[in-house]
Swiss-Prot record:
Gene: clpX
One GO-annotated biological process of the protein: proteolysis involved in protein catabolic process
UniProt similarity note: Belongs to the ClpX chaperone family.
Protein's name according to its UniProt entry: ATP-dependent Clp protease ATP-binding subunit ClpX
Top-rank taxon, per record: Bacteria
Residues given in the record as Zn(2+) binding sites: C12, C15, C34, C37
Keyword annotations of the record: ATP-binding, Chaperone, Metal-binding, Nucleotide-binding, Zinc
Length: 433
């Protein structure tokens, strides 16, 4: 009896759980660790390895080829865009290094980037991946929320505040960051004709962005919002901040076609797939005058000299996005299911049906997760309550909602340990560290 009591008192030295509360307790010299804490330690170490992978180039500037190779691991297709971005980013950070280490009469000017491409073609994701690779602060802004100073809406300086916050208020680090301004096409000038009503969310915003795009010492309100005369400001130099502006620029292909003299597609012609395939080739022939005609002001166009065009994603590209990148959606869901001890499989025609749905909705890669969530909802609801589920197969019928996913039951399957509450995990993370 005494031995039984002594055995029962064995506890994990990290989380304090007794031997009866865990599946396995591993003994060391004077200490014990349970299987749950081992699993948590493994997660923390793997997270550190991921950070090291991103920080691989901290001590040196990667070459354009290395940048593209890194992008290839996460972004499917868009080779032309990735090549231009790789060279542009390399030259930008080379310019910063050159400026900081050598004094010369030749001043290298900053070259910001303008990305054009259909919705869901990967504009935002490309910018995010670049920032992760280079380990620099990154912020996303929505151009549609911006207005001229003095009007209801956000001042352009609030974009800089987000970057400062993401750099943990390290101004020197923020000054080498990347800002992605989305929906930039939505601030195009509304009309070529002068108007008595001021265009505060269109041309006015373009004018307001000019200084920070070119490089200036900006005064940023630390709490955001509008500037007040008696408040203190954060001073930040935007000279070395790389601005990437992105937008769908719907309709600009017609302006390009008109300029190059090509015939536009017939009014009633139902050949959208051909048009989608062609749009990337048309966009590659873009010239500054096309942007001017679209409604961007000359001064703004001059401050984003590097133009990157992205292709519309076809069915094959969407299937690759689902399965091939390091963080592909299929891999993410398979990992989620594996945490519950369940194997997840997608049939080939199911993946094709998911891609077809994304094309039908005209959402590109951005809409893939929403489609996946719709398909997986019922299964993900049931799995945690049924320890006998061993495998789930997603079929084309399940994607089209004609049938449910195939669920394979194993009566002999051992019960899966359920994850603990977030608070408990955080406490244990603190103990481990």
């Amino acid at each position: 009896m005494a031995k039984f009591e002594e055995k029962k008192q064995l506890r994990c030295s990290f989380c304090g759980k007794s031997q009866d509360e865990v599946r396995r307790l591993v003994a060391g010299p004077g200490v014990y660790i349970c299987d749950e804490c081992i699993e948590l330690c493994s997660e923390i170490i793997s997270e550190d390895f991921e950070e090291e992978e991103y920080n691989e180039f901290d001590d040196r500037l990667p070459t354009p080829k290395e940048i593209k190779e890194f992008l290839d691991q996460y972004v499917v297709g868009q080779d032309h865009a990735k090549k231009i971005l790789s060279v542009a980013v390399y030259n930008h950070y080379k310019r910063i290094y050159y400026h900081n280490t050598k004094k010369d009469d030749v001043e290298l000017q900053k070259s910001n980037i303008l990305m054009l491409g259909p919705t869901g073609s990967g504009k935002t994701y490309l910018a995010q991946t670049l920032a992760k690779m280079l380990n620099v602060p990154f912020a996303i802004a929505d151009a549609t929320t911006l207005t001229e100073a003095g009007y209801v809406g956000e001042d352009v300086e609030n974009i800089l505040l987000r970057l400062i916050q993401n750099a943990d208020y390290d101004i020197e680090r923020a000054e080498r960051g990347i800002i992605y301004i989305d929906e930039i096409d939505k601030i195009a000038r509304k009309s070529d004709n002068p108007s008595i009503t001021r265009d505060v969310s269109g041309e006015g915003v373009q004018q307001a962005l000019l200084k920070i795009l070119e490089g200036t010492i900006a005064s940023v309100p630390p709490q955001g919002g509008r500037k007040h005369p008696h408040q203190e400001f954060i001073q930040i130099d935007t000279t070395n901040i790389l601005f990437i502006c992105g937008g769908a620029f719907e309709g600009i292909e017609k302006i390009i076609e008109k300029r190059i003299g090509e015939k536009t597609l017939g009014f009633n012609a139902k050949i959208e797939s051909k048009k989608e395939k062609k749009i990337g080739d048309i966009l590659r022939q873009i010239m500054p005058q096309d942007l001017l005609k679209f409604g961007m002001i000359p001064e703004f166009i001059g401050r984003v000299p590097i133009i990157v065009t992205l292709d519309a994603l076809d069915k094959e590209a969407l299937i690759k996005i689902l399965t091939e990148p390091k963080n592909a959606l299929v891999k993410q869901y398979q990992k989620l299911f594996a945490m519950d001890g369940v194997e997840l499989e997608f049939e080939k025609d199911a993946l094709e049906a998911i891609a077809d749905k994304a094309i039908e909705r005209n959402t590109g890669a951005r809409g893939l997760r929403a489609i996946m969530e719709e398909i997986m909802l019922d299964v993900m609801f049931e799995i945690p309550s049924n320890d006998k589920i061993e495998k789930v197969i997603i079929t084309k019928a399940a994607v089209l909602k004609e049938d449910k996913p195939i669920v394979i039951i194993n009566e002999n399957k051992k019960a899966q340990k359920r994850p603990k509450l977030k608070q408990r995990l955080q406490e244990r993370r603190g103990n481990v560290s």
